[in-house]
Amino acid sequence: MKIVEKIKVDCNYALVMDNWYSPEEYDKALEECKFMTPYLLKPEKSGTAKDKEGNPLKNNRAAFLSDVFSQFNTSFIGKSSINLYHSNILEKLASEDNIYSYLFDCNAHDCLVSYYEEAAYYEAHSDSATITMLTWLYDIPKSFEGGDLILINKDNTTAGVIECVPNRAVIFPSYMKHQVTEVKMKEVTDKNKGRYTISQFSMIGAVR
């Protein structure tokens, strides 16, 4: 894992990290994402952020690991998610921005697997957690355009745009507004060639 970029959003920093997984781990995580695809749910049933009228802000399919696997640690993604909490990782993150010191106190986390294909997007929103980490996975060569992450300041100006790159992780305080640009498939197929995201939500308190 290597921190390749720091993006200031209001008074804190989002950190962009490449090569989050080893090549072998990446293949296993992507394989599990594809395994989960038939179980992914529509926005209304997968923990979506909503607008003031109660309408979903996203157009994708998703499911929490805890909704698919009877035991969290039977999932490869679930087992490997603990890597974020290794002391050397936590210390490195906290040295970049002290807000990541909250990770030392987080005592609950869950992972949401999302899939974006033709016309999928997620409008500007924040998350109901303490720290959010997004990791992107897809087959190479890339079969889509879009799916980039936009970070938004409190005054609704754009703080940064992060290109969707395979095995790239982005970590940020969950209060930060962010959105996903619309995905356009180069060719519409049924072969799961779109964009997968593992959203790891770290919380202080009980799991959702």
Pin down the residues of each PLM region.
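Catalytic core of Fe(II)/2-oxoglutarate
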Residues: E145-R208
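Short histidine-centered beta-strand/loop micro-motifs
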Residues: Y122-D127, G160-E163
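A short glycine-rich, His/Asp/Glu-containing loop-to-beta-strand
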Residues: L103-Y115
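Membrane-topology and secretion signals of cell-surface/extracellular proteins
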Residues: P43-G47, P56, Y100, T132, ...
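Short beta-strand segments enriched in hydrophobic/aromatic residues
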Residues: Y21, C33, L137, S174-M176, ...
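Non-heme Fe(II)/2-oxoglutarate
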Residues: M1-I99
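Short, conserved beta-strand element in jelly-roll/cupin
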Residues: Y115-Y116, S126-S143, Q200-I204
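Residue-level detector of short, conserved catalytic/binding motifs and their immediate flanks
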Residues: Y13, C111, I131, R168, ...
